[in-house]
Amino acid sequence: MIKPLTNHGNKNIYPDNSTLIVILGPTAVGKTSLSLQLARDINGEIISADSMQIYKDMDIGTAKASQKERNIIPHYMIDIIKPDQEFSVAEYQAMVDNLIPGIVYRNKVPILVGGTGLYIRAVIEGFLFPEMDKNIELRQKLQKEAQQYGNKYVYNKLKKIDPELAKKLHPNDLRRVIRGIEVYHQTGKTMTYFKKEKQKKGDRYRNLKIGLYREREELYKRINKRVDIMIEQGLIDEVKYLLTKYPDLSKTARQGLGYKEIIGYLKREYDREEAIRLLKRNTRRYAKRQLTWFRRDQDINWFNLSTGDYKKIYSEIKKLSRDFLLDF
């Protein structure tokens, strides 16, 4: 039997294998500091839901929690692969599914924290990823066709197989286009079919979603300041080191915010000031896309951190979390 975590009035708070607290929101909104505070107060451990923090040696540009912070509260799904390796959403989902029972066994509350909506969705809703081996031969064939005839040529193949998926993808999103074709060739069923099957099953974890946001002007100021701090901390040297240590950086790592802009500068495509300007602009645009993604979800409990009374807001979040843990 799992021991109670905390006394709360006359009740006890118990973690549960199917229970998960989620803290989400755009970049630079303040997720890290709030999640650390909440984890201390409800005896939690943090699982990162950030698609860039999975990479080793990419520290400054991904704004990882410091080693000191990680020593206070255990963090997972940070520094798990090298930047020259690929990592799929399916792998992320599987690893988190394996982590949660261990966290609960230690009488801790799993807290999923991040801004990568696809990762959060994969854990909570689950994707029915077909179990199949990679078809390297087919992938190479399709990649060669894309080089010879253009991405649209391969995209049109997907359009014939899975028109619903094709509508959601840009022809230049070649990796996902090829994946859609590969799934059909390997299983005889489309990605759209697997998605619809998943939707019939409902959420995989009982969850509380806490969304953080700030007024646009304040958020953008925080983003600009964060970029300036990253540059001061040595982001340019970090990118130089990465390119030396990992000459074959994965496409995902190479295209990461803060990395693609500095890589362009190091290639002399533009000067240092332009790299910083681009990084600030691209990060602001990314934050906007994150909010657009999250606002589709009607189950998120939103908190505006721009109101000025942080103690009151945090108190509400803590109470909401405790009540959620009690109510099962």
UniProtKB/Swiss-Prot annotation:
Keywords: ATP-binding, Magnesium, Nucleotide-binding, Transferase, tRNA processing. The keyword ATP-binding applies. GO terms for biological process: tRNA modification. GO terms for molecular function: ATP binding; tRNA dimethylallyltransferase activity. Gene3D superfamilies: 1.10.20.140, P-loop containing nucleotide triphosphate hydrolases. It catalyses: adenosine(37) in tRNA + dimethylallyl diphosphate = N(6)-dimethylallyladenosine(37) in tRNA + diphosphate. Substrate binds at residues 27-32. The keyword tRNA processing applies. ATP binds at residues 25-32. InterPro entries: Dimethylallyltransferase (IPR039657), IPT (IPR018022), P-loop_NTPase (IPR027417). Its EC number is 2.5.1.75. It comes from the Bacteria. Residues 50-53 are annotated as: Interaction with substrate tRNA. The record marks 116, 139 as: Interaction with substrate tRNA. Its cofactor is Mg(2+). Belongs to the IPP transferase family. PANTHER family: TRNA DIMETHYLALLYLTRANSFERASE. Catalyzes the transfer of a dimethylallyl group onto the adenine at position 37 in tRNAs that read codons beginning with uridine, leading to the formation of N6-(dimethylallyl)adenosine (i(6)A). Monomer. HAMAP family: IPP_trans. This is tRNA dimethylallyltransferase. It comes from Halothermothrix orenii (strain H 168 / OCM 544 / DSM 9562). The lineage of its organism: Bacteria, Bacillati, Bacillota, Clostridia, Halanaerobiales.
